Amino acid sequence: QLIEKSHARGIKIVMDMIFNHCGVEHVWIKDMPCKDWFNNPDHEKNFVQTSFKLTPHVDPYASKYDFSQMNDGWFVTAMPDLNQKNPHVYRYLVQNSFWWIEYANIDGIRMDTYPYADYDAMSNWMKELNEEYPNYNTVGETWVTEPAYTAWWQKDSKLSAPKNSNLKTVMD
């Protein structure tokens, strides 16, 4: 009803989606679909927190350790980090986003914590989304304030070549 009534008044609805993490009370934590559904599944014995430093994405000389800690670490103990490198997790997230577009008729997606999810998975998701819905509105939250860092995440950016995020719009 919310979307139908909003559309009747000329209001568009943008849904906030989060592919990076979920809450610790989610059913997936209590009954994991597979052992690598999350990054750092042994978090109770060996918790790894993200470094919150996005520079390993843009630094070609960043160590694998720094990149892994930033990308695979959890925000906090209450926010399990989803493993988008797992093909089942990835496919679920893609299908779930398509379901919301088709079922609920949402007008756009704001992707929360875009850089903290797996880069290749997010790039592929955007590619699939753009192929299925070429004019769809999607914006990625990057959590960076410098224009050059923000531009790195933009689709077809020369700064991130040969990689391509396929993300049409970014915000800090």
Question: Where in this protein do the model-derived segments appear?
Answer:
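Long, low-complexity, polar/charged, intrinsically disordered or flexibly structured peripheral segments
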Residues: 63-71, 78-83
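Aromatic- and acidic-residue-enriched segments that line the glycan-binding/catalytic groove
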Residues: 19-67, 127, 152-165
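Aromatic- and glycine-enriched glycan-recognition loops and surfaces
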Residues: 1-15
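Short beta-strand segments at enzyme active-site cores
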Residues: 13-17, 110-111
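Short, flexible turn/loop "capping" segments at secondary-structure junctions
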Residues: 72-74, 102-103
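Conserved nucleotide-sugar donor-binding subdomain of glycosyltransferases
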Residues: 93
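The substrate-binding groove and active-site-proximal loops of carbohydrate-active enzymes
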Residues: 1, 24, 75-90, 107-116
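Active-site-proximal helices and loops of the catalytic beta/alpha 8
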Residues: 3, 7, 21, 29-30, ...
